[in-house]
Swiss-Prot record:
Pathway: Amino-acid biosynthesis; S-adenosyl-L-methionine biosynthesis; S-adenosyl-L-methionine from L-methionine: step 1/1. This is S-adenosylmethionine synthase. Catalyzes the formation of S-adenosylmethionine (AdoMet) from methionine and ATP. The overall synthetic reaction is composed of two sequential steps, AdoMet formation and the subsequent tripolyphosphate hydrolysis which occurs prior to release of AdoMet from the enzyme. Belongs to the AdoMet synthase family. It comes from Clostridium botulinum (strain Loch Maree / Type A3).
Length: 391
C-alpha cells in the first residue's frame, strides 16, 4: 500500500521561531546563574517591536532587552532594510513572579505531603496534561523522514545565507517535504516546497536555480528524487517582505515543527521559555528518550508513548504505548519495561537528563528531536542494553 505524508519546518528567522529563541535565551541566561529558577517566558514580535512577558522567580538578574537584541542579531536581522533591526526595534518587558498556588505544588508534591520519604517525590508536576514521545527506525535519527528532511533543508537555507553562498537570502523561510511510503517504509520524495525571503534585486529564476543547486541537491539523497518529484520554490513569485514585518510571531506557535511534523501525536503544550519543572517540556523530552531507546533496542519498528500528569503530583497518572502493529512484544509488556527501566517523576527526569542547565536555545529552531548536530541528553541511547535485558 502506498501513501503520502507531508511535514514542514521553518528557519530561525520565521517570526514564531524568533519568539521561541528569545524565550529560550531568557531561560538559558537564568539557568546559567540560578539552576533552580522558575521560568515561564512568552515573547511576541511584530513590526519594529518585541514584547517579553511571563512569570519568572529567580535569585539572579538578567538583562532581558540585551538578550533580545543579541538573539535577533544572531538570527540575522541586523539592518533596517531586512524589515526588522536588532538595534532599533523597541523591547517591552512585563514580568511577574510565579503564582504561589503553582509553586506550592511544585515545591512539595502530593506524595511528599502524604509522608512518602523518597526525595524525588518532593518535586510535583508543574501542570496537568499529557505528553507524547515518538521514534521510528525509518531514519538513522529515529525520526520520521518528512520532518527530518524538512529540518535539514531549513538548516541549509540558513547556512548558505550566513556563509555567503547565497548572500541575497534573508532570515525568514519555510520548507515542506512530502514523502511517499510503501508498506510503511519511505521510498521516494514526491514534493519539496521551499519559500525563502530574499532581497529585491534577485529574480525568481535565479532563486529557483540556486536553491536546487545549493540546498536541495546538497541535502536530499539523489536516490529519493526522480523525474516525478515536484519542486515548488517561492511559488508566490516574490518573498521580499518577511520576518516580523510580514507576520507577527508568538512563542509556542510551531509545536508540530518542534516535534514530529504531525507524524506522532502531540499533547498540545509548547516547549520554549519553560524551565524543566514544566512537564510540557521535560516529560516530552523524557518521552522521546524512552521511545528512541525502545526502538533502538528492537522492541518495535515504530513506537509512541503517552505520559500523563496531575499538577502537584510526582508520579505519572498514566503511561500508554502504541507500536502500530510493529512491536516484537505486547504493548503491555513494553509498559512494564518502561516502569522498570525509567523513572518518570519530574524530579527524576530533571536528574537523569540533567535539565537544569542552559541547553535550550540551541533547540529552539530546527527541531527539539532527532538532532545530530548537537548533543542533547534526551537523544542519547544510554538505556538500550538495560532494555534488552527485560525483553
Amino acid at each position: 500500500m502506498r501513501k503520502l505524508f507531508t511535514s514542514e519546518s521553518v528557519t530561525e528567522g520565521h517570526p514564531d521561531k524568533i519568539c521561541d529563541q528569545i524565550s529560550d535565551a531568557v531561560l538559558d541566561a537564568i539557568l546559567d546563574k540560578d539552576p533552580n529558577g522558575r521560568v515561564a517566558c512568552e515573547t511576541a514580535v511584530t513590526t519594529g517591536m518585541v514584547m517579553v512577558m511571563g512569570e519568572i522567580s529567580t535569585k539572579c538578574y538578567v538583562d532581558i532587552p540585551k538578550l533580545v537584541r543579541e538573539t535577533i542579531r544572531g538570527i540575522g536581522y541586523d539592518r533596517a532594510k531586512y524589515g526588522f533591526d536588532c538595534e532599533t526595534c523597541s523591547v517591552i518587558t512585563s514580568i511577574d513572579e510565579q503564582s504561589v498556588d503553582i509553586a506550592m505544588g511544585v515545591d512539595e508534591a502530593l506524595e511528599s505531603k502524604k509522608g512518602e520519604m523518597d526525595k524525588l517525590d518532593a518535586v510535583g508536576a508543574g501542570d496537568q496534561g499529557m505528553m507524547f514521545g515518538f521514534a521510528t527506525n525509518e531514519t538513522k535519527e529515529y525520526m520520521p523522514m518528512p520532518i527530518e528532511m524538512a529540518h535539514k533543508l531549513s538548516r541549509r537555507l540558513s547556512e548558505v545565507r550566513k556563509n555567503g553562498t547565497l548572500p541575497y537570502l534573508r532570515p525568514d523561510g519555510k520548507t515542506q517535504v512530502t514523502v511517499e511510503y510503501e508498506n510503511g517504509k519511505p521510498v521516494r520524495i514526491d514534493a519539496i516546497v521551499i519559500s525563502t525571503q530574499h532581497g529585491p534585486e534577485v529574480y525568481l529564476e535565479q532563486i529557483e536555480k540556486d536553491i536546487k543547486e545549493h540546498v536541495i541537491k546538497v541535502i536530499v539523497p539523489s536516490e529519493l528524487l526522480d523525474e516525478n518529484t515536484k519542486y515548488f520554490i517561492n511559488p508566490t513569485g516574490r518573498f521580499v517582505v518577511g520576518g516580523p514585518q510580514g507576520d507577527s510571531g508568538l512563542t509556542g506557535r510551531k509545536i508540530i515543527v518542534d516535534t514530529y511534523g504531525g507524524y506522532g501525536r502531540h499533547g498540545g503544550g509548547a516547549f520554549s521559555g519553560k524551565d524543566p519543572t514544566k512537564v510540557d517540556r521535560s516529560a516530552a523530552y523524557a518521552a522521546r528518550w524512552v521511545a528512541k531507546n525502545l526502538v533502538a533496542a528492537g522492541v518495535a519498528d515504530k513506537l509512541e508513548i503517552q505520559l500523563a500528569y496531575a499538577i502537584g503530583v510526582a508520579k505519572p497518572v498514566s503511561i500508554s504505548v502504541d507500536t502500530f502493529g510493529t512491536g516484537k512484544i505486547t504493548d503491555e509488556e513494553i509498559v512494564s519495561i518502561v516502569n522498570k527501566v525509567f523513572d518518570l517523576r519530574p524530579g527524576a527526569i530533571i536528574r537523569d537528563l540533567d535539565l537544569r542547565r542552559p541547553i535550550y536555545k540551541q533547540v529552539a529552531a530546527y527541531g527539539h528531536f532527532g538532532r545530530t548536530d548537537i548533543d542533547v541528553p534526551w537523544e542519547r541511547l544510554d538505556k538500550v542494553e538495560e532494555i534488552k535485558k527485560h525483553i
